[in-house]
Each structure stands twice: as C-alpha cells, then as structure tokens.
Amino acid sequence: MSFWFYTNKDKQTIAILAEVNNTFGERHCYFLKKPDLAPIAWGETLQAQKIFHVSPFCDVAGKYLFRFGSFNGQHIARIEYHHDGPLLITSISGSEKSIALGQLFWSALRYPAMSIGVILRIHWQALKLWIKGVKFYSKPNPPTMRVSE
C-alpha cells in the first residue's frame, strides 16, 4: 500500500491517493478527499467503498475508513475495513529520512528480498485462516476504473 498526499499552496493536505496492490499483480487507487477539497486535518476519518479484491477471506463489499497522522517526522496511516461491522483494523507507520544515492542503491538491492518475505507472510496468514475455516471468496474481475472516490 502506498499513499500520495496532495497539498494546496498553503501546504495543507487536500486529498490522498491510497494505492492498493494485491497478490495477483493488480492495482487500484482510492482518491480520498472532502467533498469541497477542504484541508484534511490529521486524525480526520475519510471513507471509501471497497471495490477491489485484496484478500480471498474478505468479500468485495463494505467500506474502508482511513485516518492519517504525523508528528515529528513520524507518519501513520490507520485503515479500518467494515462490512456489517468492523472486520479488520491495521496501521502502517514510518518516518521521514533523507536518503543518499548509495543508500538508495542498497535499498533497491534489499527490496526483492523484502518482497519475498512479505509474500511468504501473507500466504502463512492465509493458511492459518483457511485452517480455521474462514469463508473463502473467489477472485472477481478487477474494477474497470483505476481510481475510485
């Protein structure tokens, strides 16, 4: 998951593009904003209807609630998935860092190994859910639009 922040001339966040990739190599973006493009306050909840298949253990239904925060260079994104009540709550956090060309090179070399680790952890969690008997949803066709609001 990646987030792209759009700011106005006063450097206030007015929209956020939430880019979601699934394990099938597909991508969908949720364009998060207030109806009038008013500045988004840290901690404010933004909502998007779920229209993209991410997990075979969650139907393509319901909604996402997003909240973002930042303090002293630490950033956090909280994502809640609701369908007939809350089903999943997760967060992603990170910090700002300056990066030199050499660091960028080494990061690029480490990235494939990190991707393999993420895929292995995803499949391990899926196996545990399958063993528990959690309902399985077949993969539908991806949405026709690449970005939804």
List PLM regions with ranges.
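Mature, function-bearing regions of proteins
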Residues: M1-E149
